[in-house]
Swiss-Prot record:
This is Polyribonucleotide nucleotidyltransferase. The gene is pnp. It is found in: Cytoplasm. InterPro entries: ExoRNase_PH_dom1 (IPR001247), ExoRNase_PH_dom2 (IPR015847), ExoRNase_PH_dom2_sf (IPR036345), KH_dom (IPR004087), KH_dom_type_1 (IPR004088), KH_dom_type_1_sf (IPR036612), NA-bd_OB-fold (IPR012340), PNPase (IPR012162). Keywords: Cytoplasm, Magnesium, Metal-binding, Nucleotidyltransferase, RNA-binding, Transferase. It is an enzyme of class 2 (transferase).
Length: 779
């Protein structure tokens, strides 16, 4: 038998991991199956140690469109660069496995997750981390796993592990948790304003549920795992200089340099201090071996700097900018700095500054999605930009980095929870967060700036959202949670814990751990401290914009909505789209849905209103009893045609013109006359008979026409078959009594005179004047 399969139950469904069947030449290879979702996950490390000073780990998440029976929509009809969802899925796996590689490990390592089958209900993004943990565990790559990953939803107050796609639509949260047997490693969450207690409960629930998966991977490692290869952790000579440099740096004023206010000034003082110490060891930079020694001393000074900063935080509750552990940096906000944008705001917190800009568009502006999900488009876009000048650096600028995509997605999830529905606010919304300065928490600055720009644009948010980044410094059992961390604290600390939400609860959360994991107690403390910081920031935001503006920006587009009878959609479109083109020529775009919802988009409010009025007129449905101020548009021998509203005429019969007998319609009405009319009857074909309201009850109404088709009852002449008797003779072709026929040879039709009126009548009153032919009602 080829391959070996290991199974366990997870969320009431079987999870199976198979190895030894596919991709057998790689160091570690498994297939993960959950329902009908199937993934191939491989792990491979290079044989040689790289010279890089960081862990060269890459995680790729490959979506194959054949997994859902689709052909890619690209020009070449093949998969191209990974989409946003694939990148976010890869980041989930990366953040779970990265902290567990041994210190000093520098072998280039690659984990590739390929989606082979997707059933549309069991999401592959949380199965990829399980496959990565299994592949690394059974491979010869040094790694301190295993880990596991699960998704948790909350439906009707109950936690649900790995909810299906359908269940997620009813869930109050979408929480992804990864961890080891002992602790939580990674958390990512989007929620509909849930409490901190609900979040902690869900995280603990997830950690308990993943234990069966961890046990399964441990069993795999015991039965089919390979021995880990030995690697040489190149410590270098830097560690030899740390003790001596520590004493010299403290004596030279390291503490004061670390506590210097301002990122640039602090960096300059620390650099000057470092260079001064190095000169004592390397008097001649051009001498042989000086470059290697200088680099070793720089590395050693970095370790000294990190240790002293952590000591100040733990022992003295002092941070690099002089704050204590719970204080938020000073905040400055400006609303509507951009005069022509639909909504804009600048949010500055310490030395982190973000320009948030909101743009409103139509359904035609929604982004199209071509991935393995059933989603076809997204009407809310949030783009996070991190240019090199924000940190005072020079770098090559290209496409969006994975970091930018991840930070933007977090801000997007935070704000999406408070957006109105598309039915309530029928705009496609794009928010851009341009980071202008960065010294920590730029993604949280984007949440605040984006929220303010939405409020400035007049988007009716359910509540304002703010975000704050929390940090952690931990030495053994001693730890301290930090509010609103600096970039330096992010780099030298042990946790980056971002929390976003309203005054009522959390809407998004992301946690990355650099140590072996944190306990629920630390997480509770971090969430409680984050709430204090979030409420403080919301208060500062309310001082500038307490609520969304009552009106849209003058530069914002105008969108009007109305509902029409779906059967009348064709009238709005017109033959060959003629009517829609005429509407768009009035300065507006029109979209029509199958349920009859019509949306009008225009840069001008007047144009939008004019198009709406035109559509309402075209689709207006007349009702019996309604009165109108109509206009005579046509005169016929039997009556007058009166326009009630655009596209709809009615017929006012000659018998309804006056209490006295009228011989000639033109004696009473002419084309262009205005008069009040009332709808007396609408037949099965939609033809309208009118009366004059002032004559109602004074003039007998016409009898309604017999419906077309079906049984029409006996004819006036009874049956047409049999002997009808002789025809009446007429001496000329002049007028004849109603119902009379002229004599003609059998089988020969009587030709209509060239002067016969073009007007057609559907029925004829007994008191109508005689006519040379029997006219039919004109449509």
């Amino acid at each position: 038998m080829i391959g070996k399969t290991f199974t366990t139950m997870l969320g009431g469904r079987e999870l199976s991991i198979e190895t030894g069947k596919l991709a057998k030449l790689v160091s570690g290879s498994v297939t993960v199956r959950y329902g009908d979702t199937l993934l191939l996950v491989t792990a491979q490390a290079s044989d040689t140690q790289s010279k890089l000073d960081f862990l060269p780990l890459t995680v790729e998440f490959e979506e194959r469109h054949y997994a859902v029976g689709k052909i890619p929509g690209s020009f070449q009809r093949r998969e191209g660069r990974p989409g946003e969802k694939a990148i976010l899925s890869a980041r989930i796996t990366d953040r779970q496995i990265r902290p567990l590689f041994p210190k000093g490990y520098r072998h280039e390592t690659q984990v590739i997750i390929t989606v082979l089958s997707a059933d549309g209900q069991n999401a592959p993004d949380v199965l990829g981390p399980i496959g990565a943990a299994a592949a690394l565990s059974i491979s010869d790559i040094p790694w301190a796993g295993p880990t596991a990953c699960v998704r948790v939803g909350q439906i009707d107050g109950q936690y649900v592990v790995n909810p299906t796609t359908e269940q997620l639509t009813r869930s109050r949260m979408d929480l992804v948790v990864a961890g080891t047997r002992e602790a939580v490693m990674m958390v990512e969450c989007g929620a509909q304003t849930v409490s901190e207690d609900d979040l902690v409960g869900a995280i603990e629930f997830a950690h308990a549920e993943m234990q069966g998966v961890i046990a399964l991977i441990e069993q795999m490692r015991a039965e089919v795992g390979h021995e880990k290869f030995n690697f040489l952790a190149e410590e270098g000579p830097a560690n030899d200089y740390v003790p001596e440099l520590t004493e010299k740096a403290k004596a030279a004023g390291l503490r004061d340099a670390l506590l210097t206010h301002g990122k640039k000034d602090r960096s300059a003082r620390l650099k000057a201090l470092r260079n001064g110490l190095i000169e004592g060891y390397v008097p001649d930079p051009t001498a042989e071996g000086s470059a290697e020694l200088t680099q070793a001393l720089k590395d050693a000074f970095g370790k000294v700097e990190k240790r002293e900063l952590r000591r100040l935080i733990l022992e003295e509750n002092l941070r690099a900018d002089g704050r204590d552990s719970k204080t938020v940096r000073p905040i400055w906000i400006e609303a509507r700095p951009l005069p022509t944008a639909h909504g804009s705001a600048v949010f500055t917190r310490g030395e982190t500054q973000v320009l948030g800009v909101t743009t409103l568009g139509t359904e035609r502006d929604e982004i199209l999605i071509d991935d393995l999900t059933a989603e076809s488009g997204d009407k809310f876009l949030l783009h996070y930009n991190f240019p090199p000048y924000s940190t005072g650096e020079v770098k090559r600028m290209g496409g969006q980095s994975r970091r930018e995509i991840g930070h933007g997605n977090l801000a997007k999830r935070a704000i999406r929870a408070v957006l109105p529905s598309f039915e309530e606010f029928p705009y496609v919304i794009r928010v851009v967060g341009d980071v202008l300065e960065s010294n920590g928490s730029s993604s949280m600055g984007t949440v605040c700036a984006g929220t303010l720009s939405l409020m400035d644009a007049g988007v009716p948010l359910k509540a304002p959202v703010a975000g704050v980044a929390m940090g952690l410094v931990m030495e053994g059992d001693n730890y301290r949670v930090l509010t609103d961390i600096l970039g330096l604290e992010d780099a030298l600390g042990d946790m980056d814990f971002k929390v976003c939400g309203t005054a009522e609860g959390v809407t998004a959360l992301q946690m990355d751990i650099k140590v072996g994991g944190i306990t629920p107690q630390i997480m509770r403390e971090a969430l409680a401290q984050a709430k204090e910081g979030r409420l403080h920031i919301l208060g500062k935001m309310a001082e500038v914009l307490a609520a969304p503006r009552a009106e849209l920006s003058p530069t914002a587009p105008h969108i009007l909505s109305l509902k029409i009878n779906p059967e009348l959609i064709g009238k709005v479109i017109g033959p060959g789209g003629k009517q829609v083109r005429e509407l768009e020529a009035m300065g507006a775009q029109v979209t029509i849905e199958e349920d009859g919802t019509v949306r009008i988009f225009s840069a001008s409010g007047e144009s939008a209103e004019a198009v709406k009025a035109r559509i309402e007129a075209v689709t207006k449905e007349a009702k019996v009893g309604e009165e109108f101020e109509g206009t005579v548009v046509k005169i016929a021998p039997f009556g007058a045609f009166v326009n009630l509203f655009p596209g709809q005429d009615g017929m006012l019969h000659i018998s309804q013109l006056s209490e006295q007998r009228v011989e000639n319609v033109e004696d009473v009405l002419t084309v262009g006359d205005k008069l009040k009319v009332k709808i007396a009857n609408i037949d099965d074909r939609g033809k309208i008979d009118l009366i004059r309201p002032e004559l109602e009850g004074k003039v007998p109404l016409r009898e309604p026409r017999a419906p077309r088709g079906g049984d029409r009852g006996p004819r006036r002449d009874s049956d047409r078959g049999g002997d009808r008797g002789p025809r009446r003779e007429f001496s000329d072709r002049g007028p004849r009594p109603e119902g009379a026929r002229s004599e003609r040879p059998e089988g020969q039709r009587t030709e209509r005179p060239a002067t016969a009126p073009a007007t057609q009548e559907s029925s004829q009153s007994s008191d109508a004047p005689a006519a040379p032919v029997f006219p039919r009602r004109e449509d």
